[in-house]
């Protein structure tokens, strides 16, 4: 019996009488095959391969030699078509193969694209382990983010600047109130009145209010012990009763001055004083003001329930107390506001990232050696639910979020274990190979066994490689990481980079494979890239292999290690 492994505990088995499907070592379904079909499939499985497909003529000759039978006219093509149909019928409800049971390279020959040994077992176990660990990715990404010291440094700076701004605004508001306060005007008018008497020229007394703000009226007991009321409209003598009524009016704030043997009482209408002060009071800064006069009156403006911030006392007995709106709460709210303003793009990108990884998973894509028919390692590819993955990754790079995702991938593939089950490569942007980013990345890897880990340096045309990056790549090699250059032949990933990094692998971009069969220039370019990799003793990997024709053509050019949809990891 010949077995063709399709994936995890699933294979197609060929016997002389039937072709069957086994799942978990249990027969699931079987379809009879003819002797011709058995002879053809077993011959191709024995003698054909991707690197050396077997032609129809050779197959027919082998069948004649080993089975002592000759195929009828068109018998070969009919048998191949029947076998493909039976294979699809067996597997359609269990796997979605991108390959037929028999693949044909035009004018070259036939081969079986499935191995007769189970090469995926460890890779599938590793994939299952990763799938378990990629659950709750949002919470894990937040945890990684909160351990980033740079965040707390930024917050500390914003808090310091916000605190300085907060108290500066409070001082400015207080100074503005003091500058426009009625006390200075009241003192000026009191000083002027004390030098005159109630019998002075009335127009002159009334004119004292022309350049005075807020002061509504004044009561004077002059040096001749004459009591009078002075207003912008009139000067009239008053009785003691009228004086008391004038002084005790709760709608006014009154201050007394004893100057030049005269007693001057100046009063301001509370509503005018309030309107003048309220323009300097706000919810987040100066919340209120309370003033006391030497006549025993006091007046509150705004909210005076909080903690006082500043007060001043005049020699005249006048006192002002200023209150602020919960400084801690205000500073925190203002800091959050400034953080949103300053980092709104990064915050928006991070929120978008968190939404994208709600259904995030990592797919292991095999890197297959066609000569040994073994997977040499697997690339961990991130899969997001976004419209444009490339643009999404570029957004992460531009907003400094790629490090968080790279650490998330590292933790997912290790799945809380010290080592990997199979060799795995992860993509690392050059921006993570310098400065604080590299320090964090290195610290994450240093605590793990990296002998099966490959760091795949992606192409970034906007970034130049520096001596710092070369030195840091050398540090990764000391951790036993292998190094791979992705997208070789494009952008900055060129020959100069190979000579300085000495990578283990060179990955040729899929753009060189698309349309390869009909483009002689691409064939020649690819041949030169492969030769260049061999010159620098690098293992060359070709990406984007999606068809049997492309896979075989690459082997004729000397590229035997492939990656692409033609080599899926089936469960």
Curated annotation (Swiss-Prot):
Report, from the record, the phenotype seen after gene disruption: Deletion of the gene results in 33% and 61% increase in c-di-GMP levels compared to the wild-type strain in cells grown to the exponential and stationary phases, respectively. Deletion mutant shows a decrease in swimming motility.
Q: What induces it?
A: Promotes its own expression when the levels of c-di-GMP are low or when its enzyme activity is inhibited.
Please write the reaction equations for the catalytic activity of this protein. 3',3'-c-di-GMP + H2O = 5'-phosphoguanylyl(3'->5')guanosine + H(+)
Give the record's keywords alphabetically: c-di-GMP, Cell inner membrane, Cell membrane, Hydrolase, Membrane, Transmembrane, Transmembrane helix
Give its localization.
Answer: Cell inner membrane
In what residue span(s) does the EAL domain sit? Answer: 344-571
Q: Name one GO cellular component term.
A: plasma membrane
Q: What is its main location?
A: membrane
An example Gene Ontology molecular-function term: cyclic-guanylate-specific phosphodiesterase activity
- The EC number(s) attached to this protein equal 3.1.4.52
- SMART domains, A to Z: EAL (SM00052)
* Topological relation to the membrane, as annotated: Multi-pass membrane protein
- UniProt cross-references to Gene3D superfamilies, sorted A to Z: EAL domain
Q: Which residues cross the membrane?
A: 155-175, 321-341, 395-415
Domain remark in the UniProt entry? Contains a putative N-terminal DNA-binding domain, followed by a degenerated GGDEF-like domain and a conserved C-terminal EAL domain.
Further comment = Overexpression of the gene results in 52% and 60% decrease in c-di-GMP levels compared to the wild-type strain in cells grown to the exponential and stationary phases, respectively. Overexpression promotes swarming motility and expression of the swarming gene lafA, but it inhibits biofilm formation and expression of the biofilm gene cpsA.
Q: Function of this protein?
A: Cyclic di-GMP phosphodiesterase that plays an important role in modulating the global c-di-GMP pool. Its ability to alter the c-di-GMP pool has an effect on swimming motility, swarming motility and biofilm formation, multicellular behaviors that are important for the survival and dissemination of this environmental pathogen. Exhibits a dual function, namely, c-di-GMP degradation and modulation of its own expression.
Q: What is the name listed in the Swiss-Prot or TrEMBL entry for this protein?
A: Cyclic di-GMP phosphodiesterase TpdA
Q: Give the species.
A: Vibrio parahaemolyticus serotype O3:K6 (strain RIMD 2210633)
């Amino acid at each position: 019996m010949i077995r063709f492994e399709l994936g995890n505990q699933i294979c197609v088995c060929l016997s002389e009488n039937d072709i069957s499907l086994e799942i978990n070592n249990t027969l699931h379904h079987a379809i009879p095959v003819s002797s011709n079909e058995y002879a053809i499939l077993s011959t191709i499985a024995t003698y054909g391969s991707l690197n050396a497909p077997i032609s129809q003529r050779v197959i027919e000759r082998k069948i004649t030699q080993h089975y002592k039978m000759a195929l009828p006219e068109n018998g070969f093509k009919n048998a191949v078509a029947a076998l493909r149909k039976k294979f699809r019928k067996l597997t359609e409800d269990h796997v979605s193969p991108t390959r037929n049971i028999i693949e044909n390279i035009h004018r070259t020959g036939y081969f079986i694209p499935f191995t007769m040994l189970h090469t995926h077992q460890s890779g599938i176990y590793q994939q299952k382990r990763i799938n378990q660990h990629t659950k709750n990715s949002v919470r894990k990404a937040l945890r990684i983010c909160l351990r980033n010291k740079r965040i707390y440094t930024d917050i500390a700076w914003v808090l310091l600047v916000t605190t300085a701004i907060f108290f500066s605004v409070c001082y400015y508001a207080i100074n503005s109130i003091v500058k426009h306060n009625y006390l200075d005007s009241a003192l000026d008018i009191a000083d002027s009145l004390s030098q005159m008497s109630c019998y002075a020229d009335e127009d002159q007394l009334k004119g004292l209010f022309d350049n005075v703000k807020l002061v509504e009226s004044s009561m004077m007991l002059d040096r001749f012990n004459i009591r009078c009321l002075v207003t912008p409209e009139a000067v009239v003598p008053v009785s003691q009763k009228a004086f008391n009524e004038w002084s005790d009016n709760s709608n006014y704030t009154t201050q007394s001055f004893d100057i030049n043997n005269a007693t001057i009482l100046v009063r301001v209408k509370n509503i005018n004083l309030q309107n003048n002060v309220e323009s300097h009071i706000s919810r987040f800064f100066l919340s209120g003001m309370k003033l006391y006069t030497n006549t025993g009156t006091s007046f509150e403006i705004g909210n005076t329930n909080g903690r006082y911030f500043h007060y001043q006392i005049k020699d005249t007995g006048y006192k002002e107390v200023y209150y602020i709106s919960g400084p801690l709460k205000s500073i925190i709210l203002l800091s959050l506001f400034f953080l949103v303003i300053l980092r709104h793009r990064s915050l928006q990108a991070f929120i978008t990232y968190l939404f994208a990884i709600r259904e995030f998973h990592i797919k292991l894509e095999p890197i297959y050696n066609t000569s040994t028919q073994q997977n040499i390692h697997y690339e961990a590819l991130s899969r997001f639910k976004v419209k444009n993955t490339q643009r999404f990754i570029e957004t992460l790079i531009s907003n400094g979020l790629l490090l968080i995702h790279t650490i998330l991938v590292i933790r997912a593939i290790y799945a809380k274990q010290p080592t990997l089950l199979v060799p795995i490569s992860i993509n690392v942007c050059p921006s993570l190979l310098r400065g604080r980013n590299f320090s964090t990345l290195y610290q994450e890897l240093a605590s793990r066994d990296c002998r099966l880990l490959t760091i795949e340096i992606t192409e970034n045309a906007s970034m130049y490689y520096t001596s710092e990056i070369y030195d840091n790549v050398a540090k990764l090699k000391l951790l036993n990481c292998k190094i791979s250059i992705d997208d070789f032949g494009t952008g900055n990933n060129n020959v100069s980079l190979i000579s300085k990094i000495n990578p283990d692998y060179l990955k040729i971009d899929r753009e060189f494979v698309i349309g390869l069969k009909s483009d002689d220039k691409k064939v020649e370019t690819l041949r030169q890239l492969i030769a260049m990799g061999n010159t620098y003793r690098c293992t060359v990997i070709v990406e984007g292999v999606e068809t049997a024709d492309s896979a075989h053509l690459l082997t004729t050019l000397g590229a035997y290690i492939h990656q692409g949809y033609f080599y899926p990891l089936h469960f």
